[in-house]
A protein has these predicted regions:
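N-terminal Sec-pathway targeting helices
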Residues: 1-13
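Noncatalytic regulatory segments and standalone regulatory/sensor domains
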Residues: 95, 227-308
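Extracytoplasmic/secreted envelope proteins and their assembly/folding machinery
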Residues: 123-131, 141, 145-148, 165, ...
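Solvent-exposed loop/turn segments at secondary-structure junctions
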Residues: 129, 136-138, 151-156, 185-188, ...
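Mid-length scaffold segments of soluble, non-membrane domains
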Residues: 139, 150-184
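Extracytoplasmic/periplasmic, Sec-exported soluble proteins
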Residues: 114-123, 136-139, 159-164, 183, ...
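Active-site-adjacent structural segments surrounding the nucleophilic cysteine of cysteine proteases
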Residues: 8-11, 19-158, 301-308
Length: 308
């Protein structure tokens, strides 16, 4: 019996000893793992401390600018779209004068040499446009009527009374302009080239050739200005129609309507020499509607004749 008890106690003691040994061994292992973890953490902290500033996401002390998106450059306005402000475009009809339309005047209801200016005055309006726009002077269509009577054989008596090409050429040359008379070009590109290379042009149109823009107009002089190659348009002076006057119109529309029944179809003004201007008259003394953008030019007496 005593042996049995001793054996049991010996076994219990052995179990206790083994347990203590195992516990101590496990505790030592856990402490080593914990120490290694702390060492790794310290090493990581040390590594972060040694990272250059450029690699660290440090907060910026500068004020951040807002993101800029790419914007288109502002469009440059075509100067030719504003050049028309200096262009004179006189009107000839009584309806325009009744409404006091810009560039209409008392000449719209005048009777000269037995004819109505409203019937025959388109070419004279164009001549006055050219003289008043391209020189330091200005005149009315009536002034141009008297000048044409003075320097050429023009007379409105009989027929339509409209001034013919040779008389327009003579009158313009007397006022210092270089002028060329042309026939309608067979190719539109040639007409386009001629218009783009001149200061201004007078063109004879007819609705019998093309009635898309003009109707019931067997023959009528119009004035072309400031050809725009980007849009292939011209600034139109149309003395017979206030709705057409001072509008940008496709040059092709003009070409299609050019009359083919006359010896000449259009006139080009290619230059101006003030020394060759034998008139140098300036002043519009008739009642008329001067637009706000059309400033009066200094007056000057005629070198050829007094104003009538």
């Amino acid at each position: 019996m005593r042996r049995l008890i001793a054996t049991i106690l010996a076994c219990v003691l052995a179990v206790v000893v083994v347990s203590f040994v195992l516990i101590y061994h496990y505790r030592d292992k856990v402490e080593k793992v914990f120490q290694m973890t702390e060492t790794d953490s310290e090493a990581q902290s040390l590594t972060e401390a040694l990272v250059p500033e450029t690699e660290k996401a440090a907060p910026s002390t500068e004020t951040e600018l807002p993101l800029q998106t790419e914007t288109e450059a502002p469009e440059t306005e075509d100067p030719s779209l504003h050049a028309e402000d200096g262009v004179y475009t006189f009107l000839q009809g009584p309806v325009a004068w009744e409404s006091k339309a810009p560039y209409s005047g008392i000449w719209c209801e005048s009777e000269l040499d037995g004819g109505l200016f409203s019937v025959f005055g388109c070419g004279l309006c164009d001549l006055a446009n050219i003289y008043s726009t391209l020189t330091p002077f200005e005149c009315s269509p009536l002034d141009m009527y008297w000048l044409a009577r003075k320097v050429s054989d023009y007379s409105p008596g009989g027929g339509s009374g409209a001034i013919d090409w040779p008389y327009m050429k003579e009158t313009l040359q007397k006022t210092g302009f270089e002028v060329r008379l042309r026939k309608k070009d067979r190719r539109y590109e040639k007409f386009q080239e001629a218009i783009s290379g001149c200061l201004t042009a007078i063109v004879l149109i007819s609705s019998e050739e093309d009635d898309s823009y003009w109707q019931d107009t067997p023959g009528h002089y119009i004035n072309l200005w400031h050809y725009n190659p980007e849009t292939d348009q011209i600034f139109l002076g149309d003395s017979g129609n206030p709705k057409h006057n001072r509008q940008w119109v496709p040059l092709r529309t003009i070409y299609d309507a050019i009359s083919s029944q006359n010896t000449w179809q259009y006139l080009l003004v290619t230059g101006y020499d003030e020394e060759k201007n034998t008139w140098k008259y300036s002043g519009i003394h008739e009642k008329w509607t001067r637009p706000a953008w059309c400033k009066a030019k200094p007056e000057a007496k005629s070198l050829l004749m007094p104003a009538e």
